Amino acid sequence: MTLLGSEHSLLIRRKFRSVLQLRLQQRRTQEQLANQGLIPPLKSPTEFHDPRKKLDSAKTEDSLRRKVRNRSDRASLVNMHILQASTAERSIPTAQMKLKRARLADDLNEKIALRPGPLELVEKNILPMDSSVKEAIKGTEVSLSKAADAFAFEDDSSRDGLSPDQARSEDPQGSGGSTPDIKSTEAPLAGPLDTIQDLTPGSESDKNDTASQLSNQSDSGKQVLGPLSTPIPVHTAVKSKSLGDSKNRHKKPKDPKPKVKKLKYHQYIPPDQKAEKSPPPMDSAYARLLQQQQLFLQLQILSQQQQQQQQQQQQQQQQQQQQRFSYPGMHQAHLKEPNEQMTRNPNSSSTPLNNTPLSPVKNSLSGQTGVSSLKPGPLPPNLDDLKVSELRQQLRIRGLPVSGTKTALVDRLRPFQDCAGNPVPNFGDITTVTFPVTPNTLPSYQSSPSGFYHFGSTSSSPPISPASSDLSAAGSLPDTFTDASPGFGLHASPVPACTDESLLSSLNGGSGPSEPDGLDSEKDKMLVEKQKVINQLTWKLRQEQRQVEELRMQLQKQKSGCNDQKPLPFLATTIKQEDVSSCPFAAQQASGKGQGHSSDSPPPACETAQLLPHCVESSGQTHVLSSTFLSPQCSPQHSPLGTLKSPQHISLPPSPNNHYFLASSSGAQRENHGVSSPNSSQGCAQMTGLQSSDKVGPTFSIPSPTFPKSSPTVPEITQPPSYEDAVKQQMTRSQQMDELLDVLIESGEMPADAREDHSCLQKIPKIPGSSCSPTTILPKSSASFEQASSGGQISFDHYATDSEEHLEVLLNSHSPIGKVSDVTLLKIGSEEPPFDGIMDGFPGKAAEDLFSAHELLPGPLSPMHTQLSPPSVDSSGLQLSFTESPWETMEWLDLTPPSSTPGFSNLTSSGPSIFNIDFLDVTDLNLNSPMDLHLQQW
């Protein structure tokens, strides 16, 4: 709840006061302070206080000195096992610990540098591999060893002049997780690799340990890259090897090579020789690791392609056994030639597209046209002549991976040479109509198990709603939208072009090339899914069409009725009767029949329709308080809101998910052209008394400011939204209504003078009453049936004629009430009688008018099944209660914020009172008592 400025300062003041009160309660007494020596004693003079302080400090000092003197020596502490027995200095053990840590880190680095690569694991049969892969590995070993020699020669020059210990301590840092050559033990390399080989016999067992652990990680060779990315420190191996390695390291002889090569750094090398040299010196082990990784990636791609080809063959065999579904040709006449055949690549399932789930819901095709707007052109017969960049471009167009060598790229493009004759449908041709239906509301609009719909083409696009591209603005739908319509019979446009049709045509057998393997079952699933989505959409469209038809009928009736009718008296509203199915709020009924307040209602009451709330009644037809429902699922063309010469409303039942209840008031509306908030609706509870006695009681009634005496049950009170949000929502609602009226007048749905008629509505005066929520049902209780405070039941016509002058006085611009927008509700302290509090604020004549109007207005209320009872006069808080969603559009100015606190719900209600909003600035309104209580709770 957003607080206004004065309330905010009041709140802060109260908070500070409560904190100060707590501090005062908890502070120590003077006796306690004197006992602790913080202040001088109360009775003794201050001269004695200083010597006493000095005495205390001297005592503590003495006790500390005594403790230090009596401290036990080091030998006794060693005997008691408090200290370790070490005769040496204390700096020696710390130096030893540092050495040990450094040695362990060094060993660990060596182990990481010498761990086996993936190819070694394959060689030693730790990772399972096919025989073809092993042969490929053997073929690449020769080239690998040559490349490693070249790198090693460069390495010698940089490593000369260093002791072998330094060289080897640098090596693990430089190689950073590198692995030795596959055949490093069999084909020894020159240079520092000799120093590494001195360790290989000793660390062979460690290699096997790490290899076995790594093989446990990789699930039977599927995640073969796991060992590369997750180096595992083997702690047991480190502990066992730490001592032996440190001894070996210090005993090694120095490098026997001559030191003359140092001059190589200072020699002049001509530029022509520089160009012939190998790439800049890189660590040989790291270069080998990169080559191994590249090889391994290629091997992975090969094995994946082999696996998927085998899977496709199996699926093909299964499908030959199964019976194929045959779909009758539905749109053979409309089909375009290019769409009859879709290019389907048998190897396209081996591309990474299958691993990337596409989002199944897109509003338009902008996403995929960017990807596949280029038509894959015909490939040249000789792919080897193409450059690598051209090959990559072709692969990009087809959505294939572009990494790898030129031969790999050529191999990937080979299958596309065979089916180059079959054109792929151009996705630029596809026309879609985006329905204003959110996909989240469709229960069947979900992706298939693999995360996306499998289309035949290699660039698999998400499903396109097969909608007609020329829906008229009036909402009339083509006749083909029927339940019995087969799969894709939803096209009203003469040239529909959708991928669904091309899919169907390829299923119909009209296409030349044979179907790809393993796609039939996927297509069947996809078609079933699409059928569900289509049924859902047709249902939604039928609902919208029905609503539009109802609106049109109602508008015509109201137009024809407008010319005949006399201008209705005050508070009269035209009500339409609807079936039970159009009620959006399925509110239950209170048990029993309503108490008949209107057995003596005169016949003229039948002329003006009875004002009853939106409810479901058990006896056939329902009288409906027509209110405007703006469903977010309806486009503006589909929800025409007509406002005609008498205050009339249109009822448009929304979808069950969106209860936006905007009750149009027929009273004066400020900027809102056509929709006013429920809170500012006119107080017309008098009319509810006119319902016939055989009808069941309504679900809610709108209490008017006519001060009835009642004590209805009070539901729990919730917090209203903030004032700024309410004002913003009001502004947007009025803008929406203006736009709707413009659209309707342009399309010819409404006469051009509807805007003037609409502005005429604002001349009718109104009294704002507390609004009611249609969703809460309260138990039936005898107290909820109000008795009229005046003598008998006053009929509607009598009330309308008699009280007009008093209403004029009430709403007069000279009275302190002022405009309708300034009217709000006020709670008055519990001690005062109902009218004493506010009558002080009015001048004498206005007070008399108010009282006479109060006596004239009858106030029987029908059974109060409401969430908002009339605000009380005899209570210490204003009763307010709202459900969050329907009431977010309320004008919260009309409620006094300070007293709508959740602490006071059990209140007896008499009647509200009306006052000028300028009174909010007065501070002596007795608004503080509930605030104090609320702050203490807070």
Curated annotation (Swiss-Prot):
PTM text: Ubiquitinated; by STUB1/CHIP at the C-terminus, leading to its degradation by the proteasome. Phosphorylation by GSK3B is required for STUB1/CHIP-mediated ubiquitination.
A family per Pfam: RPEL
Identification of the protein by name: Myocardin
Classification via InterPro entries: Myocardin-like (IPR043451), RPEL_repeat (IPR004018), SAP_dom (IPR003034), SAP_dom_sf (IPR036361)
Keywords: Activator, Coiled coil, Nucleus, Phosphoprotein, Repeat, Transcription, Transcription regulation, Ubl conjugation
Gene Ontology terms: cellular component: chromatin; cytoplasm; nucleus; protein-DNA complex
Source organism of the structure: Rattus norvegicus (Rat)
Start and stop residues of the RPEL repeats: 18-43, 62-87, 106-131
Gene name tied to this protein: Myocd
Compositionally biased tracts (Basic residues): 248-265
Location(s) in or outside the cell: Nucleus
Taxonomic placement: Eukaryota, Metazoa, Chordata, Craniata, Vertebrata
GO molecular-function term, one example from the UniProt record: DNA-binding transcription factor binding
Domain (SAP) ranges: 383-417
